[in-house]
Design a protein with these regions (language model features):
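Flexible, glycine-rich active-site loops centered on histidine and acidic residues
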Residues: 2-17, 79-145, 187, 195
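Generic structural signal for well-ordered alpha-helices
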Residues: 24-29, 56-60, 87-91, 131-138, ...
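Hydrophobic faces of well-ordered beta-strands that scaffold small-molecule active sites
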Residues: 3-7, 39-41, 71-74, 101-105, ...
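An alpha-helical appendage that flanks or caps ligand/catalytic pockets
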Residues: 123-156, 197-218
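N-terminal beta1-alpha1-beta2 module of alpha/beta enzyme domains
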Residues: 1-69
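A conserved active-site cap/scaffold subdomain adjacent to cofactor or substrate pockets
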Residues: 175-196, 202
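Acidic-and-aromatic substrate-binding clefts and catalytic sites of carbohydrate-active enzymes
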Residues: 45-53, 79-84, 194-199
Length: 218
């Protein structure tokens, strides 16, 4: 069994916010020393108890203090962002830590409705376009071409890398499981959010509908 860590950089009484982020970096270093397989950091917004708002930046810091453990986002809330920008960020991370980067994606807002609007006024529309945005992101992350009819087919995400981040779908419902199954990517159920409710149904749906992909044939 491979054990991994999810860190949220939670706030603590009397501890400066900046220190909680530095503590997260040190926790990742310690986790690697103990032999843990993955270290993922979360994305939450406008939450007084959580200082982990920018996983890609925290991952970059951790990448320079570690050498083996896989580093990931848990996750990037895609409706807030342009898929191309996310792809570029994670290709930079892949350049810094080749073969160690996991791009965990989520559809949830990671905060309240007003905060979602502040991050992206079109977040609701982008949430409805989630599958197509995942498709575009996967192409840009992997370096595969977009369909010939795509308006952005000439755009390439940089920097060039010899390896690509591993894309994961995160979720707490059947929806995320179905999207992950459709695209043939790993799925991670947020058991700690739901107390396990819905996990068996989501995982069964995922396994029964999984479409093998080149990177994950089974």
């Amino acid at each position: 069994m491979k054990l991994s860590v999810l860190a949220q950089s939670t706030a603590a009484d009397g501890v400066p916010a900046a220190q909680t982020l530095r503590d997260t970096v040190e926790l990742a270093v310690f986790a690697e020393e103990l032999g843990y397989h993955r270290f993922w950091v979360s994305e939450h917004h406008n939450h007084p108890a959580i200082n982990g708002t920018a996983p890609e930046i925290l991952m970059a810091a951790i990448s320079q203090r570690t050498s083996r453990i896989r580093l990931g986002s848990a996750g990037v809330m895609l409706p807030h962002y342009a898929p191309l920008k996310v792809a570029e960020q994670f290709r930079v991370l892949e350049s810094l830590a080749p073969g160690r980067i996991d791009l965990g994606l989520g559809r949830a807002p990671g905060g309240d409705g007003l905060t979602s609007m502040a991050l992206n006024p079109n977040a609701h529309e982008d949430a409805n376009n989630f599958p197509s945005n995942v498709r575009d992101l996967m192409a840009w992350v992997s370096g595969d071409p977009l369909p010939s009819s795509h308006p952005f087919k000439s755009i390439v995400a940089h920097p060039e890398t010899n390896t690509a981040p591993e894309i994961w779908m995160l979720g707490t419902s059947d929806y995320g499981a179905s999207v992950a199954a459709h695209f043939g990517i790993p799925y991670c159920f947020a058991h700690f959010i739901t107390d396990g409710q819905g996990v068996k149904q989501a995982l069964t749906l995922y396994r029964d509908n999984y479409q093998p992909s080149e990177r994950f044939p089974k």
